[in-house]
């Protein structure tokens, strides 16, 4: 999965499409979205 090093720095989140895999939970998309891909979110 692609990682976001810009949009999820404080959360150290993983950039991936929904749904997030357990035990990660979706904490986006705004403002923690993955670059230009709104279908991708920040999972942490």
From Swiss-Prot:
It is found in: Nematocyst; Secreted. Expressed in tentacles. Disulfide bonds join 8-42, 15-34, 20-43. It comes from the Eukaryota. Its main location: other. GO terms for cellular component: extracellular region; nematocyst. Keywords: Disulfide bond, Nematocyst, Secreted. Peptide with unknown function. Does not exhibit antimicrobial activity against Escherichia coli and Staphylococcus aureus. Does not exhibit any effect on human ion channel TRPV1 in a Xenopus laevis oocytes assay. This is Peptide Hact-4. It comes from Heliofungia actiniformis.
